């Protein structure tokens, strides 16, 4: 059977992929942007020179919008997954204070380190992480998902799957429009 696909790497997507990988599912994680280390350079270039990379910026890339802006990464304190999320972030380098603070705050520097650590664990568990890969279409057969159409660095390809989790950020308007049209 085809592996499950998680679309979006920040931070909900990697945490979803982690849960799947720990169950032995070996998911594929697709992210249109770049890893946080490369993305940091693109963001700095934008802030200093005004050069915008439309796929790797404050909105797109590993860690999502919250990776470069305080207050964007939130977890509801009454959410059932709250403890899992915070424990995983602490386990990957976030400050322990987020486990007991009324308004948990990770901070950009800690979040970047946690994202890199989380990515390493995902790779060790067999997750196939594909940066620079944007979902451009879906294939439905009899009303059920059978494949994702993907644009990657080497061009377009079809990724067969019957299971996909969309962990899209707030700026993936083109993807939302594509899904609505499908």
Q: Which residues are covered by each model-predicted region?
A:
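Residues forming the flavin
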Residues: 1-92, 96-182
